[in-house]
A protein has these predicted regions:
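Gly/Pro-rich cap/lid or specificity-loop segments adjacent to the active site
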Residues: 28, 35-279, 283, 292, ...
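Bacterial signal peptide processing site
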Residues: 20-22
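Bacterial N-terminal signal peptides that target proteins for export
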Residues: 1-7
Length: 477
């Protein structure tokens, strides 16, 4: 088992989808007027999950009804049907991560609220044991990474495997599925709790169905809109590397060097910016301090990425090379994380330097070159413009065939006036703190809780309990 496989095993146990930073551009709900009656079928006790019933929710492939076909989505619901405060729908990340396998982990981590709420989780369309899109070459190349660059042929092959139906794997389609789930559960309102990409789905569900949301919990936030159409460049994440690593170095004993300058030097002296960034975004899942030489459940001496970066700048790259090799490879199975669904959703939802997926492929590269040339140094530092242009978001969708785009959220749209708890770790590179602050400004009834020293996925992975205590206080009120 190589380091990547070992780390991914840790992530699966900890509900980390080794880069579930949500690409977003964004999507609003499709009409579900043509949908069949929403109901849960084939109900049975969930295998290995005591107290939960697993069922099938059948949804239209195309919620407008113009294209025939259905999809079967697996749902797990707690058996406390008459929970006094109703349903808590918990949405996992990606896009590409299933929900049902994480029920035991989530139920354990937020157990104090589940005496009052009925926990429900779902394998979103294109994910999970029974519905994952399987694109073998793309899966092998990128696994669950947003940032790893796939071979162009693997992208094209994946789009062909999915076929014309790839247009129906947008966030808008998932939002329509979620409202069918609400109807099938027989509730008028529910708490919607999302992590990472799950926050994006939750935000868009609330925008499309404000009357059906009692509260929102947004953990490790992807904002619901991208007014500047720059999120494909991952500019906020690139810039966050400098501030996050510097903050980590200020913890005693303080570093005697500047880790952000080390990254900048390496990128400008032959280092592969994309692979370094990809590694750092993955590394946060095993060590939010960025300085622990021996993080739990990985080989001894594997950690302390800050030291590895500094050593590489001083001419000793072996440790950094080990980290890059160990953390930047693909390898997840589709049922753990569907790279095909990930690509289909992002390339339909997002907007790029060339526009949307409706722009012919030959016209995209010239537009990308022009946009990259306009990037200022302070937009990408400590990285460079090439890193921004070469990341997995851009390079995947650069080669994705013509696909009608999902509609965007208005750049000036606000979340509805429902109580909203926003949880953010100040060490998060996947969904940086700046995104949480941006979304808090767009939510009229938001409470932002910043957990210092924590990285991604506060409810399930925070070392302490500040975020969960905030959740426990927020939900009963």
């Amino acid at each position: 088992m190589n380091h990547k496989s070992l780390v991914l095993a840790v992530f699966a146990a900890a509900m980390a989808s080794a880069c579930t930073s949500a690409g977003h551009g964004a999507a609003v709900s499709r009409s579900a007027s043509a949908a069949p009656a929403a109901r849960l079928t084939q109900s049975h006790p969930c295998a290995g999950i005591a107290g939960f019933v697993c069922s099938t929710l059948t949804v239209p492939l195309d919620h407008s009804g113009h294209t025939p076909g259905t999809l079967d989505l697996q749902v797990a619901a707690a058996d406390n049907v008459n929970a006094p405060r109703g349903v808590l729908l918990f949405l996992t990340g990606g896009p590409g991560q299933p929900g049902v396998p994480f029920v035991p982990r989530i139920a354990n981590r937020i157990a104090p609220v589940l005496k009052d709420y009925r926990l429900v989780m779902i394998d979103q369309r294109g994910t999970g044991q029974f519905g994952a899109i399987n694109c073998p070459a793309l899966q092998a190349a990128v696994g669950s990474s947003d940032i790893t660059v796939p071979p162009p042929r693997s992208v094209q092959d994946c789009a062909n495997i999915i076929g014309p139906g790839r247009r129906f794997y947008s966030t808008a389609d998932t939002v329509a599925d979620m409202d069918m789930l609400r109807q099938a559960l027989g509730v008028q309102k529910m708490v919607v709790d999302g992590v990472s990409y799950g926050t994006f789905v939750a935000e868009h569900y609330a925008l499309a169905n404000p009357a059906h949301v009692s509260k929102l919990v947004l953990d490790s936030v992807a904002p619901h809109a991208d007014p500047g159409h720059t999120d494909a460049f991952y500019l906020v994440g690139l810039r966050a590397v400098g501030s996050v690593l510097r903050a980590a170095c200020q913890v005693k004993p303080a570093c005697a060097f500047d880790p952000a300058s080390d990254v900048a030097w390496l990128v400008r002296h032959g280092g592969d910016g994309v692979r370094i960034f990809d590694m750092l975004v993955t590394y946060e899942f095993i060590d939010p301090t960025y300085r622990n030489p021996n993080p739990a459940r990985v080989p001894r001496g594997f950690g302390d990425v800050i030291d590895a970066l500094h050593a590489a700048r001083l001419g000793q790259p072996a440790h950094l090379d080990q980290l890059i090799q160990g953390l930047n490879e693909g390898g997840d199975s589709p049922s753990q994380f569907s790279a095909g669904l990930h690509a289909a959703t992002l390339c339909t939802d997002m907007r790029f330097p060339w526009g949307s997926g409706a722009v012919p492929v030959p016209q995209r590269m010239p537009a990308l070159v022009m946009a990259t040339a306009k990037l200022a140094a302070n937009q990408v530092w400590p990285f460079d413009a090439k890193t921004a242009a070469d990341d997995g978001f851009v390079q995947t969708c650069l080669n994705w065939p013509l696909t009608p785009p999902a509609p965007e959220a208005s750049p000036t749209s606000k979340l509805p006036a429902v109580p909203t708890l926003i949880l953010a770790g100040d060490r998060d590179l996947s969904t940086p703190l700046a995104w949480a602050q941006e979304e808090a400004a767009s939510a009229p009834l938001a409470k932002l809780v910043i957990v210092h020293g924590a990285s991604h996925s506060i409810q399930t992975r925070e070392p302490g309990d500040q975020g969960r205590q905030a959740l426990y206080s927020f939900l009963p009120g």
